[in-house]
Amino acid sequence: MSFGSCSRHALFTPGALPGSFRTMTTSCVKRVYTAQIRGGDALGKRLPSVSSFPGQLPRHGSHFQSLAFFSTSRRRQTPPPPSPPTTSQSPTVPSKASTTPPTSLNTSKPVATESQDKTDWSIIAKLAGNIWPKNNPNVKFRVIGALTLLVAGKVLNVQVPFFFKTIVDSLNVPITESTTVWVLAGASIAGYGAARVLTTLFGELRNAVFASVAQNAIRKVARETFEHLLNMDMKFHLERQTGGLTRAIDRGTKGISFILSSIVFHVIPTALEISMVCGILSWKFGWDFAAVTAITMLLYTWFTIKTTAWRTTFRKQANAADNKGATVAVDSLINYEAVKSFNNEKYEVAQYDTTLKAYEKASVKIATSLAALNSGQNFIFSSALTMMMLLGAQGIVKGTMTVGDLVLVNQLVFQLSLPLNFLGTVYRELRQSLIDMDVMFNLQSLDSATKDSPTAKPLHLKGGEIEFRNVAFAYHPERPIFRDLSFKIPAGQKVAIVGPSGCGKSTVFRLLFRFYDSSSGQILIDGQDIKTVTLDSLRRSIGVVPQDTPLFHADILHNIRYGNLEATDEQVYEAARKAHVEGTIQRLPEKYATKVGERGLMISGGEKQRLAVARVLLKDPPVLFFDEATSALDVYTETELMRNINSILTGQGKTSVFIAHRLRTISDADLIIVLQDGYVAEQGTHEQLLAMPGGVYHGLWQAQLTESTQPTEEEIERQREELEVVDEKKKQQT
C-alpha cells in the first residue's frame, strides 16, 4: 500500500476535546514513489534505490509530519514493453541437433512449491557466502557496520511518535499570553526533529557502507557466470540463442542486487519494527491494541504472499515472451543484409509483433491482478486502522488515554504501513529475482562436454605431428561425419585436406581444437592424446584462420592484436605486412584506428580474411590451420598472400594444414589428404593424385580446370569496359 494522496480533514476541532485546544489543520504529506513502487511489479523494473546502488531502499524514517486521515491510493502502471535489444550480441548460429536438450531459459512453467523453496534457499545460501566471505574481514566489518546503523535507525524511528505524542499533550493546555511554544513543547519539538534527521542520516550511512559489499558480490557472480559460459563447449553455444541468453544473465545479476538489499534492509528491519510496535502497544495500551496489530500484520502478509504466488505465473509468461522478443530482434538486426536482400522486413516485423502480443497478454494479466492485490491490501490495512482509531477514541472517552496517546497509536500504525507496503513490493520482486537468479545459476551448474581431465598435463610439442586414429564423430547420431577416419600429418610439413562439400574438412579442425570430442578413436599430437592434455596448452599451440572470420566491433589494431594481446604496435604492423593487408589499411582514413563494425561488416570479406591471417601470424603458434583462408580474395591478392605464408613457413618447421576448395592454392603441399564419405579416399602429392585417373582428386581438379577456362563475370565486365575506352579514344581522334 502506498500513500499518494490524502484528505485535508482536521482530526480535532475546538471544543471537541477537554481543555482549550487549537485547531490542528493537517498538511497533506505527499509521498511520490516511482512507478515500480506504485505499480508493484512492472516487469523488468526494480526499486529506484536498487538501480542507483544496492542497499539503498526508500526511506522509512521520513514519515508523516502531522496527524491526518489518509485516503490511500495506488497508481496502476502497466509493465513497460520489452527492453530494446542490444545489437552488439554475437550472431546466433543454427544449432546442431543434439540428443541432450539444452537448459531452457523459458521460465513460464510452474514449479512445485517444495522444490522451489529448496531452490530459493540454496540461492540465498550462495549469496550469503558473498556477503560474509571467509577471508575478507573488510567486507565483514562493513556488514556489521551496516546492521548496526540499521538497528540504530529503527530505534530512533520508533521514537518519533513518542515525541509527537508529547508535543500534542504539551499543547493541549490553556494558552496564556506568556505561553510560548518553546516553553510548552520546545524540547519535544527539538527531539522530534533530531530523531527524524538522525533516522535519515543513519539510513544513508547504512546504504553507503553496504554499497561496496553488494556491488562486490554482483561483480563476483557476474564474472563467474561469464567465465563459465566462455568455458562451455561449442555445442552449448550453438544450441542457444544469444538474445535470450544475455537477457537471462542480465536479469539474474539485477536480481542479486535486489535480493541483497531487500533481505538485509527490508525483511530483517520490517520484522524488527513490527515486533517493537506490537510490544509498545501492548505495554502502553493493552493487549487489544497489540492483538489488532498482530492480526493485521499476519493477514496482510498472508494475503500478499498468496496473491503474489498466483501472479507469479503471469510474470514467468511475460519473461518468456521478453526472451523470445529479444532473440527475434537481435537475429533480425544482425542479419540485416539478408532481411533487405529478400525484402522480408514485413515478415520480421510480424515475427517480432507475435512476441510482443504474447508479452502484451501477460502484461495485461499482471496489471489486472495487481489491482486485485492493491484493493485487498488497502481493505485490510484500512479496516485495521479504523479499529485502532475506534479503540483509541473509546480510551479518550473513558479517560484512560490522552489525545497524545491517540496520536501515538495513529503514528505507530502508520509507521507500519510503509514497511508493510514495501514488504509486499519486496516480496513480489524477491520472488521474481529468485526466479531470474535460478536461471542464471542453472547456467553455472551446466558441465562442459569438453573439459580438462583431472590428470591432464600440458602439451609438450616436439615437432607437431598430428594423427587421427580410427576417429568416429557425428553432430547428429543419424548423420555421422566420420566413421573410422585415420590419417597422419607429418611434423613440420605443409598438408592440405580437400574433398567434396560436407565431407568434414572443417570438422577436422573442430575436433583437433577440441570444440567437440570424438565419439571414438584417438587424436594425437606428437603421440599425446589431446584428451589427456590441458585445453589451454592445446589451444595455445594451434593457430587457425577460420572460414567465417570472427572480428570484434573494435578498431583494426585491436582485432589483429587479439592474436597476442602482449604484442607491440610494431609487431602488429609487421603481421599486417606479412598478411598483405598493410596497404589496404594505410588507404583507410583512420588507418589502424578504423572501426570494422559489428562482426567486421564494414570491411570486405577479403579484408576480413587477411586480418584473420595477420592475427594468427601474430600468435605465431607451432601448428597452423587455414580453413578456406583465401576464399574471398581475388587471384592476384591470393597469390601474393600464399607466397608470403609459404615464405613464413619455409625453414621454421611449423606444421601447417590447409583446407581448400581451390586446388591450385595447395598444389605445392607436401601431402594432400582427400576425404569422402567419412573416410580418407586418397592421399599423396599433387602429382601422385593426378596420376590416378578416375580418382576423387583427379575429378575435382579436372572440374576446376574446366571452370577456370571459362571467363568469369568480372572478366567479361572488364573486357567490356576496355572496349568502351578504346571506342571513346577512337571518337576523340576522329
UniProtKB/Swiss-Prot annotation:
Membrane topology of the entry: Multi-pass membrane protein
Family matches, as SUPFAM superfamilies: ABC transporter transmembrane region (SSF90123), P-loop containing nucleoside triphosphate hydrolases (SSF52540)
UniProt subcellular location: Mitochondrion inner membrane
GO cellular component: mitochondrial inner membrane
Listed SMART domains: AAA
Signal peptide: none
Pfam family, one: ABC_tran
ABC transmembrane type-1 domain residues: 143-432
Residues annotated as binding ATP: Y475, G499, P500, S501, G502, C503, G504, K505, S506, T507, V508, F509, R510
Function: Performs an essential function in the generation of cytoplasmic iron-sulfur proteins by mediating the ATP-dependent export of Fe/S cluster precursors synthesized by NFS1 and other mitochondrial proteins. Hydrolyzes ATP. Binds glutathione and may function by transporting a glutathione-conjugated iron-sulfur compound.
Similarity field: Belongs to the ABC transporter superfamily. ABCB family. Heavy Metal importer (TC 3.A.1.210) subfamily.
This protein's name: Iron-sulfur clusters transporter ATM1, mitochondrial
Organism for this UniProt entry: Cryptococcus neoformans var. neoformans serotype D (strain JEC21 / ATCC MYA-565)
UniProt gene name: ATM1
